[in-house]
Protein backbone atom coordinates (compact mmCIF):
# COMPACT_ATOMS: atom_id res chain seq x y z
CA UNK A 1 0.00 0.00 0.00
CA UNK A 2 1.43 3.35 -1.06
CA UNK A 3 1.76 6.30 1.33
CA UNK A 4 1.51 8.71 -1.60
CA UNK A 5 -1.50 11.03 -1.47
CA UNK A 6 -4.50 10.10 -3.62
CA UNK A 7 -5.85 12.46 -6.27
CA UNK A 8 -9.44 13.50 -5.64
CA UNK A 9 -11.81 15.50 -7.83
CA UNK A 10 -13.04 18.89 -6.64
CA UNK A 11 -16.84 18.79 -6.73
CA UNK A 12 -17.66 22.34 -5.65
CA UNK A 13 -16.03 25.56 -4.48
CA UNK A 14 -17.78 28.37 -2.60
CA UNK A 15 -16.07 31.69 -1.86
CA UNK A 16 -17.64 33.32 1.20
CA UNK A 17 -15.45 36.41 1.48
CA UNK A 18 -12.23 37.77 0.01
CA UNK A 19 -10.43 35.72 2.70
CA UNK A 20 -12.47 32.53 3.20
CA UNK A 21 -13.67 29.71 0.95
CA UNK A 22 -14.83 26.12 1.15
CA UNK A 23 -14.43 23.22 -1.25
CA UNK A 24 -15.71 19.68 -1.44
CA UNK A 25 -14.02 16.75 -3.12
CA UNK A 26 -14.57 13.07 -3.74
CA UNK A 27 -13.88 10.65 -0.93
CA UNK A 28 -12.09 7.36 -1.58
CA UNK A 29 -14.19 4.38 -0.45
CA UNK A 30 -11.36 3.21 1.79
CA UNK A 31 -10.89 6.61 3.49
CA UNK A 32 -11.96 6.46 7.15
CA UNK A 33 -11.75 9.25 9.71
CA UNK A 34 -13.29 10.31 13.01
CA UNK A 35 -15.31 13.52 13.01
CA UNK A 36 -13.00 16.33 14.14
CA UNK A 37 -9.78 14.94 12.62
CA UNK A 38 -7.53 16.63 10.07
CA UNK A 39 -5.71 15.38 6.99
CA UNK A 40 -2.98 16.59 4.66
CA UNK A 41 -4.42 18.30 1.56
CA UNK A 42 -2.48 19.80 -1.30
CA UNK A 43 -1.51 20.26 -4.90
CA UNK A 44 1.47 19.11 -6.96
CA UNK A 45 4.47 21.36 -6.28
CA UNK A 46 6.66 23.04 -8.87
CA UNK A 47 9.55 20.70 -8.01
CA UNK A 48 7.42 17.60 -8.59
CA UNK A 49 6.90 16.97 -4.87
CA UNK A 50 3.41 17.41 -3.40
CA UNK A 51 2.79 20.68 -1.54
CA UNK A 52 0.69 19.60 1.45
CA UNK A 53 -0.79 21.33 4.49
CA UNK A 54 -3.02 20.11 7.33
CA UNK A 55 -6.74 20.81 6.91
CA UNK A 56 -9.52 19.81 9.29
CA UNK A 57 -12.24 17.74 7.66
CA UNK A 58 -15.49 19.73 7.95
CA UNK A 59 -17.77 16.95 6.73
CA UNK A 60 -19.03 14.32 9.16
CA UNK A 61 -17.49 10.87 9.01
CA UNK A 62 -20.61 9.37 7.37
CA UNK A 63 -20.65 11.75 4.37
CA UNK A 64 -19.79 10.48 0.87
CA UNK A 65 -17.76 13.62 0.11
CA UNK A 66 -15.06 15.56 1.96
CA UNK A 67 -15.50 19.24 2.82
CA UNK A 68 -12.73 21.68 3.75
CA UNK A 69 -12.46 25.38 4.64
CA UNK A 70 -9.45 27.49 3.72
CA UNK A 71 -8.30 31.05 4.09
CA UNK A 72 -6.85 32.93 1.13
CA UNK A 73 -3.23 34.01 1.46
CA UNK A 74 -1.98 35.83 -1.64
CA UNK A 75 1.63 34.72 -1.27
CA UNK A 76 1.00 31.47 0.63
CA UNK A 77 2.84 28.50 -0.87
CA UNK A 78 -0.35 26.41 -1.06
CA UNK A 79 -3.31 28.74 -0.49
CA UNK A 80 -2.25 31.12 -3.28
CA UNK A 81 -2.93 28.21 -5.67
CA UNK A 82 -5.66 26.39 -3.74
CA UNK A 83 -7.93 29.45 -3.74
CA UNK A 84 -8.06 29.25 -7.56
CA UNK A 85 -9.35 25.67 -7.79
CA UNK A 86 -12.68 24.98 -9.43
CA UNK A 87 -15.02 22.02 -9.86
CA UNK A 88 -13.34 19.33 -11.93
CA UNK A 89 -9.81 20.13 -10.72
CA UNK A 90 -7.83 17.60 -8.69
CA UNK A 91 -6.44 17.93 -5.16
CA UNK A 92 -4.12 15.64 -3.26
CA UNK A 93 -5.49 13.85 -0.19
CA UNK A 94 -3.20 12.32 2.43
CA UNK A 95 -3.75 8.78 3.64
CA UNK A 96 -3.76 9.14 7.42
CA UNK A 97 -6.22 11.40 9.27
CA UNK A 98 -5.16 12.42 12.78
CA UNK A 99 -6.23 14.73 15.58
CA UNK A 100 -7.45 14.94 19.14
CA UNK A 101 -10.61 17.07 18.73
CA UNK A 102 -12.75 13.94 18.44
CA UNK A 103 -15.76 12.57 20.32
CA UNK A 104 -13.66 10.20 22.42
CA UNK A 105 -11.81 13.20 23.86
CA UNK A 106 -14.96 15.11 24.88
CA UNK A 107 -16.26 14.74 28.40
CA UNK A 108 -19.91 13.71 28.72
CA UNK A 109 -22.30 16.48 29.69
CA UNK A 110 -25.54 18.26 28.91
CA UNK A 111 -24.01 21.10 26.91
CA UNK A 112 -21.08 21.43 24.58
CA UNK A 113 -19.73 24.90 23.85
CA UNK A 114 -17.51 25.35 20.80
CA UNK A 115 -15.72 28.61 20.01
CA UNK A 116 -13.70 29.32 16.90
CA UNK A 117 -12.89 31.86 14.24
CA UNK A 118 -12.46 31.45 10.49
CA UNK A 119 -11.36 28.00 9.41
CA UNK A 120 -11.25 26.86 13.05
CA UNK A 121 -14.94 26.14 12.55
CA UNK A 122 -14.16 23.09 10.35
CA UNK A 123 -13.70 20.40 13.03
CA UNK A 124 -16.76 21.73 14.86
CA UNK A 125 -18.79 21.47 11.63
CA UNK A 126 -17.77 17.82 11.45
CA UNK A 127 -18.66 17.12 15.08
CA UNK A 128 -22.04 18.89 15.14
CA UNK A 129 -23.20 16.91 12.09
CA UNK A 130 -22.19 13.59 13.65
CA UNK A 131 -25.21 11.94 15.33
CA UNK A 132 -22.87 10.33 17.89
CA UNK A 133 -22.26 13.81 19.35
CA UNK A 134 -25.80 13.78 20.71
Region locations from a protein language model:
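Ferredoxin-reductase
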Residues: 2-89
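FNR/FR-type flavoprotein reductase catalytic core
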Residues: 77-134
Amino acid sequence: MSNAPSEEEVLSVEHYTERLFKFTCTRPQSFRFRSGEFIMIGLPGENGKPLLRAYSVASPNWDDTLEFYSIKVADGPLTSKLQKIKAGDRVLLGKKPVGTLVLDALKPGKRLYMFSTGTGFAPFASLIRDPETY
